[in-house]
Structure formats: C-alpha cells, structure tokens
UniProtKB/Swiss-Prot annotation:
Residues 207-211, 269-270 are annotated as: Interaction with DNA substrate. This is Aprataxin. GO terms for cellular component: nucleolus; nucleoplasm; nucleus. The histidine triad, also called HIT motif, forms part of the binding loop for the alpha-phosphate of purine mononucleotide. The FHA-like domain mediates interaction with NCL; XRCC1 and XRCC4. The record marks S188, H265, H276, K291 as: Interaction with DNA substrate. The gene is APTX.
C-alpha cells in the first residue's frame, strides 16, 4: 500500500461552493444565499426596492449549492416570475444560472451566480471566481433560449433537457457565470456554432430548451429591446424576420409534414426581440409544465403576421392587460380543444395528432 501525503496548504484549505443573488442593474450589493438556508427577500433597504406592490417578504430563496440551482418560493401576493413564467402564491420553482428572476410584476430582475471559496481554518476566506470584463453579474448564456441543439434531427435535441453528467453540469454552471447576461445573447448570435442562418439583418439560432421537435429563434442584429420598442420604422425588418423564419422551415423541415407557427411571446424572457419558429408537435421533454404550454397555445403567443399588421396600422405593438394570467389556464389541446388534466396526459394525447 502506498502512502499519499498531502501538502499543508491542501490540508488547511477547503473548497466550498457559495451562491449569490445579483441585481442585474447593480442597484445594490449581492446577497449571499448560504447552502440550504431559507433567505427571505423583498421590499426593503437591502434590495432598495420601495415599490409597495413588492412585499417585504416577497420570496423565499434556498440555494442548492451542490446541485447548482436555487429554489424560489413566492410568498408575496403579487406575481414573482422566472423567465416570465409566474411562480404563483406559495408555489415553488427552480432558478438556474442563466435564468432571470423578476421579483414582482416583471420588475427588479435578478440572477444567481455560484463561486468556489477556499476556506482556511481561522483565516479569511479566499474566493475563486471567474469574471469577464468588469461585470460582476452572470451571463445569461445567450438567454435560456439561445444555445443550439446538437441532436440527430435539425432543430431538435430533447436529450438536452435531461440532467447532464455532473462534470458537464458544473462546467456549464461556470460558463454561465462568465459575464453579464445582457451580453450573452449578443455573444451567442455571433457564435458560428450556434447559427443556423444569417444575413445582414438577422441571425437564426436554435432554442436552448426547444419546446417541440423544431424550435428556432430569429433575432435582428439591430438592438431592439422588446416589442414595446418596435415602431413603423421596423416594419420591413419584421417582415424579413418572418420570411427568414419560413425559409428555415423550408430548409430544415421541408420534408416534414409538421405544421409550424411563427410568433412572439407577449412578455418575452429576453431583452432582445426574437421571433419563435416552432413546430406544432410539441414533442420535447423540455415542455414540462402548464406555463410552458400556455405560452405557446394561448393569446400569450402573438402571431408574427398579427404583430406586423398591428405595427402597420397603429405604429406600435399593444399587449393587453392580464397576459400573465393566461399562463394559468387549464391545459387544452391546440388541435381539438380537449381539456387534459396533466402534462403527461396532454403529451400522450398529442400523439394522436402527429402526422402519419
């Protein structure tokens, strides 16, 4: 038996993982989320939130540092959301690196970042943290929706929604904390490995978490924060985005009998206009809950042509009140309108409507 000796420094220093809650606009310092400890966050001096619609106890956060996510429980009455999906009073969702937590009413955006800390007994903690530029926040990794699939079928890779091996997951977590998320989308748009199509006006990338066999995003190179910023000056661009979406369908799914829709989410999860091009099979393990389904199968999903007509007639896009409530509607088949009690039963039902 061989004897293995450890250096004094190796013995005296222990690496631990810690989690931080980071306000995207840097209005206040980061909030530490100790491993498995419940932390209440809301209106108050710590967050500098004074909005009375935000409760002093708006959310309860519990970091799973070893697993790389934070459990978020909505405690306040007004809606807290993750990537524009409302959690619901006394309900809980997982917040992962790259996702955006809006504290209340789609306001006050936060992200999480994980760090490795080297602790020496009796000495000051040493942090080991990757940075990009001067940013202290995490990159949103081209948003939750931007990283390309790499499956056997173009536009589809259901396996990427399953739990990856731990080493890969840790590597992905570190990658997601390289820079501020608002830079991430631009980085992905310009990454040749992520691009399906590009021209001088737009680029098409695969959705990171496709909700169907085929799911792409068409994004303009021009910086347009959201549909609210769209004017008549953007009409030709909107038309071009629609045309490119149809081209991608023809190029990559031309032999498929699947039906497609092109449209925008009424309340998008990224601060850059993006057109969803999605097949209507909804055959993907990434489609996990009612909010996922309703975001594509209610009026929450704005048809591309309807948006173009709205801008042409009114000069802007108007989103009616109450859109978040649509995400709570019962599950209803988009083909035959039958009500289904659960996502697994809905998915089984949808198989009946797939092209033979």
């Amino acid at each position: 038996m061989s004897n293995v000796s450890l250096s004094p420094s190796a013995v005296s220093r222990i690496m631990t993982r810690v989690c931080w809650l980071v306000r995207q606009d840097s209005r206040h310092q980061r909030i530490k989320l100790p491993h498995l400890e419940a932390v209440i966050v809301g209106r108050g001096p710590e967050t500098k939130i004074t909005d009375k619609k935000c409760s002093r106890q708006q959310v309860q956060l519990k970091a799973e540092c070893n697993k790389g996510y934070v459990k978020v429980k909505q405690v306040g009455v007004n809606p807290t959301s993750i990537d524009s999906v409302i959690i619901g009073k006394d309900q809980e969702m997982k917040l992962q690196p790259g996702q955006v937590l809006h504290m209340v009413n789609e306001l006050y955006p936060y992200v999480i970042e994980f760090e490795e800390e080297a602790k020496s007994p009796g000495l000051k903690t040493h942090r080991k943290r990757k940075r990009s530029g001067n940013s202290d926040s995490v990159e949103r990794d081209a948003s939750q929706e931007a990283k390309p699939s790499t499956g056997a079928e173009p536009g589809s890779n259901p396996s990427q929604c399953s739990v990856p091996p731990k080493k890969e997951k840790d590597a992905a977590t570190k990658k997601e904390s390289l820079s501020h998320w608002s830079q991430g989308l631009k980085i992905s748009m310009e990454d040749p490995k992520m691009q399906v199509y590009k021209d001088d006006q737009v680029v098409v990338i695969k959705d990171k978490y496709p909700k169907a066999r085929y799911h792409w995003l068409v994004l303009p190179w021009a910086s347009i924060s959201s549909l609210k910023a769209v004017t008549r000056e953007h009409l030709e661009l909107l038309r071009h985005m629609h045309t490119v979406g149809e081209k991608v369908i023809a190029d990559f799914a031309g032999s498929s009998k699947l039906r497609f829709r092109l449209g925008y989410h009424a309340i998008p999860s990224m601060s850059h206009v993006h057109l969803h091009v999605i097949s209507q099979d909804f055959d993907s393990p990434c489609l996990k809950n009612k909010k996922h389904w309703n975001s594509f199968n209610t009026e929450y999903f704005l048809e591309s042509q309807a948006v173009i007509e709205m801008v042409q007639e009114a000069g802007r896009v108007t989103v009616r009140d109450g859109m978040p409530e649509l995400l709570k509607l019962p599950l209803r088949c988009h083909e035959c309108q039958q009500l289904l009690p659960s996502i697994p039963q809905l998915k089984e039902h949808l198989r009946k409507h797939w092209p033979k």
